[in-house]
Amino acid sequence: MPRDGMVYKLNYLLKSQSPTSPAAQQILAAYLKAAEERKIIPGTRAGEGEYDVKQSMDVIIRESPGQVLALAKAMRKRLGELSTGCLVKLAHDLLGAAPKVPAGQRAELESLLYDEYRPPLVDRLRNDMGSLELIDAVVALTALKNPNAGWQELGKERYADRIWRYTTLEPKGEDVLHHREGKRFRNITLPAELKGWSEPGFDDSGWKKGKAPIGVGLYGDSNLHFKNATPWGDDEFVLMRTTFELDSTDFDNVRVRVLNNQGYDIYLNGSKVYTYIWWCYTPEYGKGLACDKNLLKKGTNHLAVRAGSVYPKDVHVGQIDVYVEGLRKKDLLDAGKRP
């Protein structure tokens, strides 16, 4: 397998050729052979061989949809050699490429991913339920034949229908930050009446109420954005609280999904579960933040959030929505069993 310099030159040449040209086909055949045959030496040098294999796989998946199925078949015998991270990436990349492969190959590729790639990932998951990346890979492959397996939104009502109590506040004194500052999320002094605002017993009956996302301005663009369900207002920060009901807490993994453009603090039943101090560029509900499952309780659970906003070109923009998901190990691992 050529090293980085030669790989760069080959990729440059590949991009300059028609995908069906003899030169391009020869280069792609070499990459396929490298992915299939490059030796991965066990031990401390395993990463070197695996890096070369990943380079070859990436080129084929990116440049030649017509050879994705051939790559998936070629890599079957190597699945046990790959690290969990590499195997997870390969499964995700092959699954992501499925819509682009020739229509006549798509069903075979998806069956191959479910029948031959999913089992070794499940085996690894039995011993590592703490890896959200591994869980997501198994969920994605399981969804090919059982879309209901995997993460479940917690609560008896959809998060989009949930009512939040919220209030906004503008920093004062030394907490004020110029609008041109992009990194804005920070601790600020709260008024005395907001002491304990994140605790389950706090009285928020005087706050405004509405559904999420709570927002102001346009986060994203006209083609990619989530519509604000409730107006944020003019202040820089928002505090928001809601509840959800559970009949059972027998989840092996719990995670929090967040739509945000600036930083936030999240509390579950009074305990802070996550703080994010930076910003996001793309409107999406993030894949999820691992959360201590022991914080959940039967009955009413309390979710509290403090979020910030930003002022690009002096236009006020902020958006926040949060919900919780749970996963049962048995439901996921048994989902692919044949009757």
Regions found by a protein language model. Give the residues of each.
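Long, ordered, helix-rich scaffold segments
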Residues: 1-151
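An acidic-aromatic loop/edge-strand motif
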Residues: 151, 156-193, 279, 290-339
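Surface-exposed, low-complexity/disordered Ser/Thr/Gly/Pro/Asn-rich loops and linkers
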Residues: 200, 205-234
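Aromatic-lined ligand-binding clefts that engage carbohydrates, nucleic acids, or primary amines
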Residues: 207, 236, 244-270, 303
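Short beta-strands within extracellular/lumenal beta-sheet-rich domains
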Residues: 234-245, 286-288
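Solvent-exposed beta-strand/loop surfaces of large extracellular or lumenal domains
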Residues: 268-289
